Amino acid sequence: MSEKDLNFSLIHTPDGQTRPDEQADKKFSFTNLSKEFDDHIDRSIRGYSTLRTDVVSLSRYFVENDTTVLDLGCSQGSLIRRMYENNDHVRSTKYIGVELNDSFQEHWKEEEELKYIVDDITTMEFPKNLSLVTSLFTFQFIPERKRVPLMEKIYDNLIEGGAFVFSEKLLSIGGKVQNMMEFMYYDYKREHFTEKEILDKEIELRHLAKLTNEDLLIKQLLGVGFRQIQTFWRNFNFVGMVALKIPSNNWDKK
Protein backbone atom coordinates (compact mmCIF):
# COMPACT_ATOMS: atom_id res chain seq x y z
CA MET A 1 0.00 0.00 0.00
CA SER A 2 1.44 3.38 -1.02
CA GLU A 3 1.61 6.43 1.23
CA LYS A 4 -1.13 7.96 -0.89
CA ASP A 5 -3.35 4.92 -0.39
CA LEU A 6 -2.63 5.00 3.33
CA ASN A 7 -3.79 8.61 3.55
CA PHE A 8 -7.04 7.62 1.86
CA SER A 9 -7.64 4.63 4.15
CA LEU A 10 -7.20 6.35 7.51
CA ILE A 11 -9.38 9.00 9.07
CA HIS A 12 -8.44 11.48 11.80
CA THR A 13 -10.55 11.49 14.95
CA PRO A 14 -11.24 14.56 17.13
CA ASP A 15 -8.70 13.39 19.76
CA GLY A 16 -5.88 13.44 17.20
CA GLN A 17 -5.80 9.69 16.62
CA THR A 18 -6.48 7.80 13.41
CA ARG A 19 -8.79 4.92 12.63
CA PRO A 20 -9.41 2.75 9.57
CA ASP A 21 -11.85 4.28 7.13
CA GLU A 22 -14.57 1.66 6.81
CA GLN A 23 -16.28 3.71 4.09
CA ALA A 24 -13.14 4.14 1.97
CA ASP A 25 -14.33 1.86 -0.82
CA LYS A 26 -17.90 3.16 -0.83
CA LYS A 27 -18.94 6.01 -3.09
CA PHE A 28 -20.77 8.86 -1.43
CA SER A 29 -24.55 8.80 -1.67
CA PHE A 30 -27.34 9.67 0.75
CA THR A 31 -28.68 6.13 0.36
CA ASN A 32 -25.35 4.62 1.46
CA LEU A 33 -25.36 6.96 4.46
CA SER A 34 -28.94 6.28 5.57
CA LYS A 35 -27.82 4.24 8.60
CA GLU A 36 -25.43 6.92 9.87
CA PHE A 37 -26.78 10.08 8.29
CA ASP A 38 -27.11 12.20 11.43
CA ASP A 39 -23.58 11.31 12.51
CA HIS A 40 -22.26 12.13 9.04
CA ILE A 41 -23.88 15.58 9.04
CA ASP A 42 -22.63 16.22 12.58
CA ARG A 43 -19.10 15.63 11.30
CA SER A 44 -19.68 17.53 8.06
CA ILE A 45 -21.10 20.78 9.43
CA ARG A 46 -19.50 22.40 12.46
CA GLY A 47 -22.17 23.25 15.00
CA TYR A 48 -24.89 21.14 13.37
CA SER A 49 -26.00 19.66 16.69
CA THR A 50 -26.34 23.19 18.08
CA LEU A 51 -28.38 24.19 15.03
CA ARG A 52 -30.84 21.35 15.61
CA THR A 53 -31.12 22.22 19.30
CA ASP A 54 -31.82 25.84 18.34
CA VAL A 55 -34.55 24.75 15.91
CA VAL A 56 -36.21 22.68 18.63
CA SER A 57 -36.02 25.66 21.00
CA LEU A 58 -37.51 27.97 18.36
CA SER A 59 -40.33 25.52 17.73
CA ARG A 60 -41.77 26.19 21.18
CA TYR A 61 -42.53 29.77 20.12
CA PHE A 62 -44.61 28.73 17.11
CA VAL A 63 -46.26 25.33 17.64
CA GLU A 64 -49.94 25.81 18.51
CA ASN A 65 -52.88 23.63 19.51
CA ASP A 66 -54.75 21.86 16.70
CA THR A 67 -52.12 22.62 14.05
CA THR A 68 -49.54 20.65 12.07
CA VAL A 69 -45.74 20.79 12.14
CA LEU A 70 -44.00 19.74 8.93
CA ASP A 71 -40.31 18.82 8.53
CA LEU A 72 -39.23 18.79 4.88
CA GLY A 73 -36.42 16.39 4.06
CA CYS A 74 -36.56 14.70 7.46
CA SER A 75 -33.97 11.96 6.68
CA GLN A 76 -33.73 9.78 9.82
CA GLY A 77 -36.57 11.71 11.42
CA SER A 78 -34.77 12.81 14.57
CA LEU A 79 -35.56 16.54 14.32
CA ILE A 80 -39.32 16.16 13.97
CA ARG A 81 -39.27 13.63 16.82
CA ARG A 82 -37.41 16.04 19.08
CA MET A 83 -39.94 18.76 18.31
CA TYR A 84 -42.74 16.32 19.05
CA GLU A 85 -41.15 15.39 22.39
CA ASN A 86 -40.35 18.97 23.41
CA ASN A 87 -43.72 20.58 22.75
CA ASP A 88 -45.89 18.79 25.28
CA HIS A 89 -47.44 22.15 26.24
CA VAL A 90 -49.73 21.96 23.19
CA ARG A 91 -52.53 19.52 22.41
CA SER A 92 -53.90 17.88 19.27
CA THR A 93 -50.85 18.91 17.24
CA LYS A 94 -49.72 16.66 14.41
CA TYR A 95 -46.06 16.21 13.48
CA ILE A 96 -45.17 15.00 9.99
CA GLY A 97 -41.74 14.25 8.57
CA VAL A 98 -41.44 14.09 4.78
CA GLU A 99 -38.55 12.41 2.98
CA LEU A 100 -38.05 11.55 -0.68
CA ASN A 101 -35.43 8.83 -0.07
CA ASP A 102 -37.20 5.70 1.19
CA SER A 103 -33.96 4.18 2.53
CA PHE A 104 -34.48 6.22 5.72
CA GLN A 105 -37.76 4.48 6.63
CA GLU A 106 -36.16 1.91 8.92
CA HIS A 107 -35.28 4.71 11.36
CA TRP A 108 -38.80 6.07 11.67
CA LYS A 109 -40.76 5.30 14.82
CA GLU A 110 -44.27 6.66 14.59
CA GLU A 111 -46.56 7.75 17.39
CA GLU A 112 -50.25 8.65 17.36
CA GLU A 113 -49.44 12.27 16.49
CA LEU A 114 -46.05 11.69 14.83
CA LYS A 115 -46.05 10.35 11.28
CA TYR A 116 -43.56 9.98 8.45
CA ILE A 117 -44.23 9.82 4.74
CA VAL A 118 -42.19 9.23 1.60
CA ASP A 119 -43.10 11.93 -0.90
CA ASP A 120 -41.82 14.72 -3.14
CA ILE A 121 -42.21 18.00 -1.27
CA THR A 122 -42.41 19.95 -4.55
CA THR A 123 -45.55 18.12 -5.70
CA MET A 124 -47.29 16.87 -2.55
CA GLU A 125 -50.25 18.67 -1.02
CA PHE A 126 -49.48 20.32 2.31
CA PRO A 127 -51.84 20.44 5.31
CA LYS A 128 -53.60 23.81 5.50
CA ASN A 129 -53.09 24.44 9.21
CA LEU A 130 -49.31 24.58 9.52
CA SER A 131 -47.93 26.44 12.52
CA LEU A 132 -44.32 25.55 11.73
CA VAL A 133 -42.38 24.24 8.74
CA THR A 134 -38.74 23.22 9.12
CA SER A 135 -36.19 22.33 6.48
CA LEU A 136 -32.50 21.69 7.17
CA PHE A 137 -30.25 21.85 4.10
CA THR A 138 -32.96 20.70 1.71
CA PHE A 139 -33.68 23.59 -0.65
CA GLN A 140 -30.20 23.47 -2.17
CA PHE A 141 -31.07 20.05 -3.64
CA ILE A 142 -34.33 21.26 -5.18
CA PRO A 143 -34.28 22.44 -8.83
CA GLU A 144 -34.04 26.21 -8.85
CA ARG A 145 -37.25 26.65 -10.86
CA LYS A 146 -39.20 24.82 -8.13
CA ARG A 147 -37.91 26.74 -5.11
CA VAL A 148 -40.12 29.82 -5.23
CA PRO A 149 -43.29 27.76 -5.88
CA LEU A 150 -42.34 25.64 -2.85
CA MET A 151 -41.84 28.77 -0.75
CA GLU A 152 -45.28 29.96 -1.88
CA LYS A 153 -46.83 26.64 -0.90
CA ILE A 154 -45.24 26.83 2.54
CA TYR A 155 -46.40 30.42 3.04
CA ASP A 156 -49.94 29.79 1.81
CA ASN A 157 -50.45 26.87 4.20
CA LEU A 158 -48.99 28.50 7.30
CA ILE A 159 -51.39 30.02 9.79
CA GLU A 160 -50.91 33.69 10.66
CA GLY A 161 -48.08 33.87 13.15
CA GLY A 162 -46.57 30.67 11.77
CA ALA A 163 -42.93 30.30 10.80
CA PHE A 164 -40.64 28.72 8.26
CA VAL A 165 -37.40 27.73 10.03
CA PHE A 166 -34.69 26.50 7.71
CA SER A 167 -30.96 26.22 7.05
CA GLU A 168 -28.98 26.30 3.82
CA LYS A 169 -25.43 26.47 2.55
CA LEU A 170 -25.13 29.79 0.73
CA LEU A 171 -22.70 31.43 -1.66
CA SER A 172 -20.76 34.48 -0.56
CA ILE A 173 -21.35 37.65 -2.56
CA GLY A 174 -17.67 38.12 -3.44
CA GLY A 175 -15.34 35.54 -4.94
CA LYS A 176 -12.52 36.31 -2.50
CA VAL A 177 -14.71 35.72 0.55
CA GLN A 178 -16.19 32.61 -1.06
CA ASN A 179 -12.70 31.16 -1.52
CA MET A 180 -11.79 31.96 2.08
CA MET A 181 -14.90 30.23 3.39
CA GLU A 182 -14.39 27.19 1.18
CA PHE A 183 -10.75 26.73 2.21
CA MET A 184 -11.57 27.14 5.90
CA TYR A 185 -14.39 24.63 5.56
CA TYR A 186 -12.12 22.22 3.69
CA ASP A 187 -9.59 22.38 6.54
CA TYR A 188 -12.39 21.59 8.97
CA LYS A 189 -13.57 18.60 6.92
CA ARG A 190 -10.06 17.16 6.84
CA GLU A 191 -10.28 16.72 10.61
CA HIS A 192 -13.25 14.37 10.21
CA PHE A 193 -12.97 12.74 6.77
CA THR A 194 -10.36 11.25 4.49
CA GLU A 195 -9.30 13.02 1.33
CA LYS A 196 -11.12 10.37 -0.68
CA GLU A 197 -14.36 10.85 1.24
CA ILE A 198 -14.19 14.61 0.73
CA LEU A 199 -13.47 14.29 -2.99
CA ASP A 200 -16.18 11.66 -3.60
CA LYS A 201 -18.78 13.81 -1.86
CA GLU A 202 -17.76 16.96 -3.75
CA ILE A 203 -18.01 15.13 -7.08
CA GLU A 204 -21.45 13.75 -6.23
CA LEU A 205 -22.88 17.00 -4.86
CA ARG A 206 -21.53 19.03 -7.76
CA HIS A 207 -24.47 17.81 -9.83
CA LEU A 208 -27.04 17.81 -7.02
CA ALA A 209 -26.57 20.94 -4.92
CA LYS A 210 -27.26 24.32 -6.53
CA LEU A 211 -26.43 27.08 -4.07
CA THR A 212 -27.89 30.57 -3.96
CA ASN A 213 -26.76 33.70 -2.11
CA GLU A 214 -28.33 35.27 0.94
CA ASP A 215 -29.61 38.40 -0.80
CA LEU A 216 -31.49 36.43 -3.45
CA LEU A 217 -32.89 34.01 -0.87
CA ILE A 218 -34.28 36.84 1.27
CA LYS A 219 -35.70 38.55 -1.83
CA GLN A 220 -37.52 35.33 -2.76
CA LEU A 221 -38.92 34.90 0.75
CA LEU A 222 -40.15 38.49 0.84
CA GLY A 223 -41.63 38.05 -2.62
CA VAL A 224 -43.95 35.25 -1.52
CA GLY A 225 -45.10 37.18 1.56
CA PHE A 226 -42.78 36.36 4.47
CA ARG A 227 -41.78 39.17 6.84
CA GLN A 228 -39.26 39.61 9.65
CA ILE A 229 -36.67 37.25 8.21
CA GLN A 230 -33.93 36.71 10.77
CA THR A 231 -30.67 34.75 10.83
CA PHE A 232 -30.31 32.82 14.12
CA TRP A 233 -27.35 30.54 13.34
CA ARG A 234 -24.29 30.76 11.10
CA ASN A 235 -21.09 28.79 10.56
CA PHE A 236 -18.86 29.30 7.52
CA ASN A 237 -21.38 29.56 4.64
CA PHE A 238 -24.03 27.52 6.48
CA VAL A 239 -26.91 29.67 7.70
CA GLY A 240 -30.04 29.09 9.78
CA MET A 241 -32.96 31.52 9.32
CA VAL A 242 -36.52 32.03 10.49
CA ALA A 243 -39.17 33.68 8.29
CA LEU A 244 -42.50 34.74 9.79
CA LYS A 245 -45.98 34.91 8.31
CA ILE A 246 -47.69 37.85 9.95
CA PRO A 247 -50.88 39.79 9.13
CA SER A 248 -50.28 42.71 6.78
CA ASN A 249 -51.61 45.21 9.34
CA ASN A 250 -48.79 44.13 11.70
CA TRP A 251 -45.97 44.56 9.20
CA ASP A 252 -43.01 46.53 10.41
CA LYS A 253 -43.21 49.80 8.48
CA LYS A 254 -39.59 50.77 9.12
Spans of model-derived segments:
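Conserved beta-strand signature within the Rossmann-like core of class I S-adenosyl-L-methionine
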Residues: G161-K169
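C-terminal alpha-helical "lid/dimerization" subdomain adjacent to the S-adenosyl-L-methionine
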Residues: K169-Q220
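Core SAM-dependent methyltransferase catalytic element
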Residues: V224-K254
